[in-house]
Every structure is written in structure tokens, then in C-alpha cells.
Amino acid sequence: LTLAAACMASFTFAQDAPLWMRHCAISPDGTTIAFTYKGDIYTVPVGGGRAMQLTTNPAHDTEPVWSPDSKRIAFASDRMGSMDVYIVSKEGGEPRRLTTHSGSETPVAFSDAGHILFSADIMPSAETVLFPSNGQFRQVYKVSVEGGRPVLYSPMPMERISINKEGTILYQDKKGYEDYWRKHQVSPIARDIWMYAPDEKPAYRQLTAFGGEDREPVWAPDGKSFY
């Protein structure tokens, strides 16, 4: 009886205080948080309340990304063997597969209401890369929310992308193989923040030059300053 009571208490705690809810993403309208829990995508109001499960596939669903109108969510899933990009309504329903490459593809942002940027390592030949990446130096591609053939958006790594309403991109670069979680790193290959504005010249502009790590930029609501 004591063991049974302990097991029941442990189960109750796991349900009331779940752990390892990851990859949180706040909707652009500021009302809802999408997150990953036990390999599925959930949403919950920012003020708290009951979470709604959006995906129920036995595969691993992760990395939710909101559309600009806060009505759809793109995510990565390995339900067909490797990570592909899927899209689903925030109300639930059957997700639609958008990419089909045998490599790993992960959504990073909506470039606009009709297109999703995703990271992948699928360059076709050695002539297209600067040095061997071992999957670490991923390119950025763009695909329509209706599906179709993806197009190359950036041959260089653009990590932790944040896009404002004008379409200007903030991202962190990647210069080497250094461990992402190495403490107190100060080196020439530490990450820096860059801005990419397609309609400006120069289109790329380095915003930080600290010897340590500068990373994970996020636009402020005004679209002019960032964290």
C-alpha cells in the first residue's frame, strides 16, 4: 500500500507540475504560447490555464514557429523518418507536410504570411560549401505554406532568426565548431549578432563585436530595437 501510494503521488505530481516543456514560442499577437512536451506540440494562454494538445503522432514533434497572423504553427517532425517541416492550425487538425528531403529540416521563422524559412544541410556538392560541416553549418531555405519546391535563401548559417514587420532579419552567426554551451568563451569564433535587410546596401551588417558570445536576438515590439 505504501509503494502504491508513493507511485500515485509521483504520477499526480507529474501531471500537475510537468517537467521538460521546451521550445516555447509566443504568438505575434501576444495571446498564446506554443511549446513542446513529450514529443508533441501544445498551446496555452499566456495568462495560464489548460494547455491544448495540437499533435498526437507517436513521432517526435518539436520546434514550433508561429505565422505572422498567429493562426498557424509550423513545426518539425520525424514522423516520416527524418525531420521535415509541417504546418497546422492553432486550433488543431491534421498537420500538412511541406518538405520531403531525407535530411533534417527545422523551421526557424515565417518570412511572411506565405513562406517559411527552415534550416537544413542539403547542399548538393562539395563545391557549394566552404569547409566540411558535419551537419553543423546548416543553410537556410524558404518554402511556401502551400508546399512545393524549396529555394535556397542563405548558403551561410543564420541561427536564431528573428524577423520584424518590415522583413528585416536579426540572427546569430556561426564561425566554428565550438561547443554551444562552453562557459566564458572568448575567442575569434564566438557568435555575433548580424542584421540582414534584403532591400538595403549593404544587405548584411554586423551589430556586435564582443569577444565573447552574443546570441539569440529578438526584435522589440517597435521593430527598431532588439534584445
Regions found by a protein language model. Name each.
Residues P45:
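Periplasmic/extracellular electron-transfer cofactor-ligation site
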Residues P28-D29, P68-D69, S111-A113, N164-E166, ...:
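Residue-level detector of Asp-centered blade-edge/turn motifs that repeat once per structural unit
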Residues A17-P18, T36-Y42, R50, T55-D61, ...:
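A flexible loop/linker signature enriched in serine peptidases of the S9 family
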Residues P18-I26:
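Extended, small-residue-rich solenoid/repeat segments and analogous flexible loops
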Residues T12-D16:
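Boundary at the C-terminal end of the N-terminal hydrophobic targeting segment
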